[in-house]
């Protein structure tokens, strides 16, 4: 098999901007890209014929444009468009499918390369001293860990991209902390209360089927096998070995099977389908990755600070919204949430049972050759009495093997636990289930842990170590019996509606609740929250919506009783506008038995979510009013008694992170900040600045009330929804707001890119953990320089005005958006259990969710939400004093982590924008009578883009976009060269589809040649392909 020549168009001498040579590692990447590309071509040739391959070759070669900042010419666009317009629908669909498959294959190769690169970087970091020590110039350098970047030149021989690759690992971090003379006791204090929580969410635009994800993993495994073969065979003939030929044949067949598989969901997934999808990442990767993360951190600490203790094993913990998030999703019912908890427990118990089977094979020591403690012998005797059937079955086989006998009892109890869980998942059996004897199964993971630790102690006392047993214990410490904590979320208006209906039925208010002023609501709610008298009658004669709201809190209570409090402690209130929104949920929690007014004890953490810019501005005042209520403060402390003890402590007691009382979850308030709706509301720059300010203010309010704050960041996958590299984002948080605690959403769309492969998962978890420790110990003071804050306030206000003047004040913009983007067709995708609009809203921007909003602009190559308004803001500031202010903005970029993060995200987004393609969406999808007004809007967008791009390149001093991130630059350029034809295919299919739809609506006559369903399928396939090509949905 000859793989020496690529099928088409990948330049082998590209180095990011066209001026340089590839590294050895990039050469390996391009070898794999060529191989996969040629196999893709061969499969298409055999499946569809040479004519399709020739068509794809022609379209791709015409669409190729080299530089990352250049746009394809109108002449080329017209040539491709004319070719596409003459395609039969079946050929257009096949072309769309082929391009989508191509991009997904390229993604796998890149992801595979990234995984190898991350392994190599980690190994180098563990072997070498840091770069500054190698260069012998450390005294003169300002560490990038503190500043985000430095204006001083790097030491001789150190490349900026090389330096970036070295940071983010535990070994690098610990050496950096030592180099900066951070006191070991400060490091230990932080490690002792390190608390990182990652929350998996379902994603309304998660476009890739589960079936396709499995194929992606199989392709990756074959690529890994080829890497091993290439590394083990010397010389250039490794491709001619029998093993290599076999692997390439397997890869060819995987691509062939993929081509013959439907890319689109054939039905709208249920919530439980989404639960299954999210649990897959735990099953395949995360179950083993998180314990490995703990080991890696412990090893790095030991090598640099041998006297420090590693953090507890579950310092990084996963939660989930899938099955618990009912905001705007009527499909998430109490029964679905219960089923989700059972599914999670069933998966983790099955993993433990498999591990126990492995231990039985390993732990074979005999009493003939080793001793065991009396404690273990006593436990075996108790087991014999409690589980006599196991003794009768296995006592002869294991009579001299105490560990195997013990594991047999443990296995039986765990099997009974799993059997009981399966019956709990069945609604019919749940009602009639006979309770098992307590000694025959485990109620909690801690009970199983005690038995495994008993075995571990015996092994240690006799000089034995079992790595597999240690791994299982760590997994139990991390995942328990629930795998992930379920967060509940509901919109604030649902609780207000329920309280209003309850109050009206009970006749307890003279004024309807919904008409009361905020201070009157707080007064009445305060009274109700300080009495044990129930408010809700048992029969619940209310509307279905109110009954469901009440039942949700009761289900939460039942889940805690059956699965333990850890299964669900968090209740998030979206669209929190007032303090009463929080107290309404607390009142419903009281009625469900989750809160006792007499003692203030409770088992629920209520989390307000502030999403819009207005809510973010009001958030500090809302929390101040809540913290000022004695009964609310007592709920945070855990009880009135605990609050009194805390108030008797000295003032600085609450400012010292070493105090163990601060680790008490009862003294903690979690607050969530939303990136998606604030961005949609006010634009990228304003949103980021308002969130930054709100965090500082919330931290100050919490500290003034002696409350510990944990900020929950609702970051999306795209830049327009707060996405981007987590490492930079965490370092850009205001100083003092992280302090070893952070909670972040991991959106469904990014799960595959972060957690589909073990080393990728570990890399993401390690860089995230490194950033949290780094941000907590090396705090930047730049966030508190008042003149800088005033400048950012000015920039944010100007950007917000520019953004809203287009999005909300331009009367033609809504029509423009609905016409030139595929938002109507996106709603047809069978990809989510949740509707695209809130409350079944009408076609306006206020009801449209942020995710399809961003998804639509990404498809059309505008990517508008992630940059619009930034250029106007920067120009307005620079024009006041061009030389001085441009110098100041550059200084911000190189010194201030927050500003660096903002500009870096804008730069990355601009690299993906192609307004030449976007203009064709406008020209081809607009009606003749709309073109003049739509062209005016497009010219306004184009002017803002050019302005933003020019300023981004000027501030960063990059001759080309992304010159500071070679890997990302390479990836973006690779896609920009190929995605053009797919966008034009989408335009053609959308145009045909809308024409057919319009004719059917106006005349009732269907377009005879192609049905609406056929055209819709073709359009959806292009949406699928562009999402893969952009590596982004919403």
UniProtKB/Swiss-Prot annotation:
Protein species of origin: Synechocystis sp. (strain ATCC 27184 / PCC 6803 / Kazusa)
A GO CC term attached to the entry: cytosol
Xref: SUPFAM superfamilies: Phosphoenolpyruvate/pyruvate domain
Catalysed reaction equations from the record: oxaloacetate + phosphate = phosphoenolpyruvate + hydrogencarbonate
Catalytic residue list: 203, 680
Keyword Lyase in annotation: yes
Similarity remark: Belongs to the PEPCase type 1 family.
Pfam families membership: PEPcase (PF00311)
Source species, domain of life: Bacteria
HAMAP family tied to this protein: PEPcase_type1 (MF_00595)
Protein name listed in UniProt: Phosphoenolpyruvate carboxylase
Annotated InterPro entries: PEP_COase, PEP_COase_bac/pln-type, PEP_COase_Lys_AS, PEPCASE_His_AS, Pyrv/PenolPyrv_kinase-like_dom
EC number annotated for this UniProt entry: 4.1.1.31
GO molecular function: magnesium ion binding; phosphoenolpyruvate carboxylase activity
Keyword Magnesium attributed: yes
Alphabetically ordered keywords of this record: Carbon dioxide fixation, Lyase, Magnesium
The encoding gene: ppc
């Amino acid at each position: 098999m000859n793989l020496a020549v690529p099928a088409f168009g990948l330049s082998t001498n590209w180095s990011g901007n066209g001026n340089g040579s590839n590294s050895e590692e990039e050469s390996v990447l391009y070898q794999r890209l060529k191989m996969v590309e040629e196999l893709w071509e061969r499969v298409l040739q055999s499946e569809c014929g040479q004519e399709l391959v020739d068509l794809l070759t022609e379209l791709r070669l015409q669409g190729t444009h080299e530089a990352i900042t250049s746009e394809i010419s109108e002449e080329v666009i017209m040539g491709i468009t004319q070719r596409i317009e003459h395609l039969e629908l079946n050929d257009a669909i096949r072309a769309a499918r082929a391009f989508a498959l191509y991009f997904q294959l390229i993604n796998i190769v890149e992801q595979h390369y990234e995984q190898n690169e991350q392994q190599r970087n980690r190994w180098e970091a563990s072997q070498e001293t840091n770069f500054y020590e190698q260069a012998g110039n450390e005294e003169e350098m300002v560490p990038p860990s503190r500043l985000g970047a430095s204006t001083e030149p790097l030491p001789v021989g150190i490349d900026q991209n090389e330096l970036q690759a070295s940071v983010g690992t535990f070994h690098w971090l610990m050496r950096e902390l030592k180099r900066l003379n951070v006191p070991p006791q400060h490091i230990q204090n932080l490690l002792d209360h390190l608390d990182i929580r990652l929350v998996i969410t379902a994603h309304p635009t998660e476009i890739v089927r589960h079936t396709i994800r499995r194929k992606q993993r199989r392709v990756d495994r074959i690529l890994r096998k080829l890497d091993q073969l290439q590394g083990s065979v010397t010389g250039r003939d490794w491709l001619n070995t029998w093993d290599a030929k076999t692997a390439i044949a397997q890869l060819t067949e995987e691509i062939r099977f993929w081509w013959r598989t439907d890319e689109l969901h054939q039905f709208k997934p249920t919530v439980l389908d989404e639960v299954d999808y999210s649990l897959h990442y735990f099953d395949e990767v995360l179950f083993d990755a998180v314990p490995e993360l703990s080991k890696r951190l412990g090893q790095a600490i030991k090598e640099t600070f041998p006297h420090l203790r590693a953090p507890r094993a579950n310092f990084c913990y996963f939660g989930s919204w899938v099955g618990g998030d009912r905001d705007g999703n009527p499909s998430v019912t109490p029964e679905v949430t219960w089923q989700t908890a059972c599914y999670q427990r069933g998966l983790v118990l099955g993993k433990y049972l498999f591990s126990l089977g492995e231990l039985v094979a390993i732990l074979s020591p005999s009493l003939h050759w080793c001793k065991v403690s009396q404690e273990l012998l006593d436990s075996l005797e108790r087991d014999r009495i409690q589980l006599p059937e196991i003794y009768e079955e296995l006592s002869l086989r294991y009579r001299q093997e105490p560990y195997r006998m013990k594991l047999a009892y443990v296995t039986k109890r765990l099997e009974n636990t799993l059997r009981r869980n399966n019956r709990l998942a069945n609604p019919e059996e749940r009602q009639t289930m006979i309770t098992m004897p307590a000694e025959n199964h485990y109620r909690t993971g801690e009970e199983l842990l005690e038995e495994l630790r008993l075995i571990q102690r015996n092994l240690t006392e006799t000089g034995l170590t079992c790595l597999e047993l240690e791994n299982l214990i760590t997994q139990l410490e991390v995942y328990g019996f629930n795998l992930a904590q379920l967060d509940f979320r509901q919109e604030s208006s649902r609780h207000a509606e329920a309280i209003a209906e309850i109050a009206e039925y009970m006749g307890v208010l003279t004024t309807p609740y919904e008409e009361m002023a905020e201070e009157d609501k707080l007064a009445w709610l305060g009274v109700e929250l300080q009495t044990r008298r129930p408010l809700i009658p048992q029969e619940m004669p209310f509307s279905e919506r109110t009954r469901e709201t009440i039942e949700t809190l009761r289900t939460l209570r039942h889940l805690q009783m059956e699965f333990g409090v850890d299964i669900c402690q968090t209740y998030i209130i979206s669209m929190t506008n007032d303090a009463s929104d929080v107290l309404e949920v607390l009142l419903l929690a009281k009625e469900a038995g989750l809160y006792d007014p007499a003692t203030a004890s409770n088992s629920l953490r209520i989390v307000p979510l502030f999403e819009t810019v207005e809510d973010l501005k009001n958030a500090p005042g809302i929390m101040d009013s809540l913290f000022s209520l004695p009964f609310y403060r007592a709920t945070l402390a855990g009880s009135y008694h605990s609050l009194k003890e805390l108030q008797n402590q000295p003032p600085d007691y609450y400012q010292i992170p070493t105090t163990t009382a601060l680790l008490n979850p009862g003294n903690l308030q979690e607050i969530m900040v939303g990136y998606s709706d604030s961005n949609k509301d006010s634009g990228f720059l304003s949103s980021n600045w308002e969130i930054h300010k709100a965090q500082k203010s919330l931290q100050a309010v919490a500290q003034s009330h002696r409350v510990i704050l944990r900020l929950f960041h609702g970051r999306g996958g795209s830049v327009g929804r707060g996405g981007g590299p987590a490492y930079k984002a965490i370092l850009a948080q205001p100083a003092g707001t992280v302090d070893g605690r952070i909670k972040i959403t991991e959106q469904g769309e990014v799960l595959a890119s972060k957690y589909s492969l073990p080393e990728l998962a570990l890399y993401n978890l390690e860089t995230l953990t490194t950033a949290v420790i780094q941000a907590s110990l090396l705090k930047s003071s730049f966030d508190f320089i008042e003149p800088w804050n005033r400048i950012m306030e000015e920039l944010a206000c100007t950007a917000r005005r520019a953004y809203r003047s287009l999005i909300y004040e331009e009367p033609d913009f809504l029509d423009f958006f609905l016409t030139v983007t595929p938002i109507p067709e996106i709603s047809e995708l069978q990809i989510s259990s949740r509707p695209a609009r809130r409350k079944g809203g009408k076609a306006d921007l206020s009801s449209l969710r942020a995710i399809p909003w961003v998804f639509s602009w990404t498809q059309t190559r505008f990517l508008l939400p992630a940059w619009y308004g930034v250029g106007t803001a920067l120009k307005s500031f620079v024009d006041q004093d061009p030389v001085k202010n441009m110098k100041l903005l550059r200084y911000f970029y190189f010194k201030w982590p927050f500003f660096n993060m903002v500009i870096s995200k804008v730069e990355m987004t601009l690299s993906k924008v192609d307004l030449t393609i976007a203009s064709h969406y406008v020209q081809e999808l607009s009606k003749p009578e709309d073109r003049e007004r739509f062209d005016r809007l497009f010219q306004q967008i184009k002017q803002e883009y050019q302005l933003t791009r020019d300023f981004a390149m000027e501030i960063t001093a990059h001759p080309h976009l992304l010159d500071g991130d070679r890997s990302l630059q390479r990836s973006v350029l690779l896609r920009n060269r190929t995605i053009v034809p797919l966008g034009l295919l989408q335009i053609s299919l959308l145009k045909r589809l809308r024409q057919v739809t319009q004719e059917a609506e106006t005349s009732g006559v269907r377009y005879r040649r192609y049905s609406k369903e056929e055209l819709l399928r073709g359009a959806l396939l292009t949406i699928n392909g562009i999402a893969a090509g952009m590596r982004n949905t919403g």
